[in-house]
Amino acid sequence: MCVRYLLSNSYVLEGDILLHNPKIIQKYQYQSNYCGIKVDRTDDWCLFENKGRVTGYAVGGENCHQIMGITYWTEEDGKKLGEYIKKVYEMPGGKERYWDQVALQYYIDDFDIAIRECSFDDFIEIDTFNELKAIDKSYDV
């Protein structure tokens, strides 16, 4: 079975995230959302919002929310996202797109995505093998 059929009422976590705060994963979510940290400036992926609704994203920005790699999708939005992923994949150049671009760029007007506030203490992003070894000594061989 293809993962795009499993997005309804589901969390999606990027593979390089180590979750420190288990309360980020909650039994009930009532709106699709991205976990984000309010920052004055970032060179990382970030979200822009208006009145609690995500209105855009970019690599780098000011007065934005830095994306932390954890999202939640409602039943309705998960179904739409699954369908739209297939459509974007079939577009010219679609195979080179990130899955996030589907809801945040190509079909942003079809989603009502909120930002869930979190902090840098809630996660660790592991970008290098050395960072992984610092966290898990079993890799230090």
What are these regions (language model features)?
Residues 20-93:
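Conserved core of the sugar-phosphate nucleotidyltransferase
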Residues 1-9:
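Short phosphate-binding loop-to-helix
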Residues 18-20, 132:
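General alpha-helical segment detector with a strong preference for membrane-spanning helices
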Residues 10, 32, 113:
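Hydrophobic anchor at the start of a short beta-strand
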Residues 9-18:
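Short beta-strand-to-loop acidic/aromatic patch adjacent to the donor-nucleotide binding site
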Residues 4, 24-26, 103-104:
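Short amphipathic alpha-helical segments and helix-helix/interface helices
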Residues 12, 28, 40, 108-111, ...:
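A generic structural signal for short, non-catalytic loop/turn and secondary-structure boundary residues
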